[in-house]
Amino acid sequence: RAVGSTGSGRHLAAVLLGADVVKNEITAHAVAASHLFPGAKTIIEIGGQDSKIIILRNNIVHDFAMNTVCAAGTGSFLDQQSARLNIPIQEFGDYAVKSGHPVRIAGRCGVFAESDMIHKQQMGFPVEDIIMGLCEALVRNYLNNVGKGKKIEEPVVFQGGVAANRGLAKAFEKILGLKINVPAHYEVMGAIGAAILAREQIELSHSPTRFRGDNFVLEGNFTSNSHECSGCPNLCEVVCIKRDNEVLAYWGDRCKKW
């Protein structure tokens, strides 16, 4: 048994669970893709809040880029549009692949994309063509921003929660002219990669896992507080995590004083 943590909340999860390995999302996604698709060269990852591209060579991260500024093309933007159209997000991709003639949607900005979609609705275009047009616009936006200057080669793996949208996978294939592979567990590839790394760490070190057990989290009373450290001009905001009034960890201090 072994536990790994990754993602934006990996440090907090590591403290609560007792993780054996703490890895960034780039490494975790790369490990998972290489494990399930040996020889993979390009990873397209689009989640709820951000998107990224990872270039692999010989199963090693060669280059990567992330977009954490603009929401256009992320899962949250697609959720907003599915709600506006009164279509369950689970069916969004199904509508898109039924399109016969996708309409051109401006996808460089989420605000403009939504405005353009409304305009196309008012003109009477079928909703399937509008949704597929949105998918193609988001793919162009992704390639012009996140994928700019990157050499995208096969095998290409599409992962992250947005990979559930068959319309986006189809749009990537159409625009890139490449086959897009979607893993069975596309939404948790980062977790799979962290788990693989944790298992390897335990096997190499021959040491017991640091996993605290389910009850540690389920039965404990957790609290957190923060304060500004005045020990130096950095004025770091230090966060303290406690379980039943026992300090588990501090972080946020640059000098590791706490």
Q: Where in this protein do the model-derived segments appear?
A:
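Short beta-strand-loop/turn "lid" adjacent to the catalytic site in phosphate-handling enzymes
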Residues: R1-I26, H62-D63
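Short glycine-aspartate micro-motif
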Residues: A2-G4, K41-I44
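Adenine-nucleotide phosphate-binding core of ATP-dependent small-molecule kinases
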Residues: S115-N144
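Glycine-rich phosphate-binding/hydrolytic loop that grips phosphoryl groups
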Residues: V31, L78-D79, A184-G213
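Conserved phosphate-binding/catalytic loops in two-lobed NTP-binding clefts
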Residues: D20-T27, E173-I192
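Glycine-rich phosphate-binding loop plus the immediately following alpha-helix
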Residues: N58-H101, E200, R243-D244, W251-W258
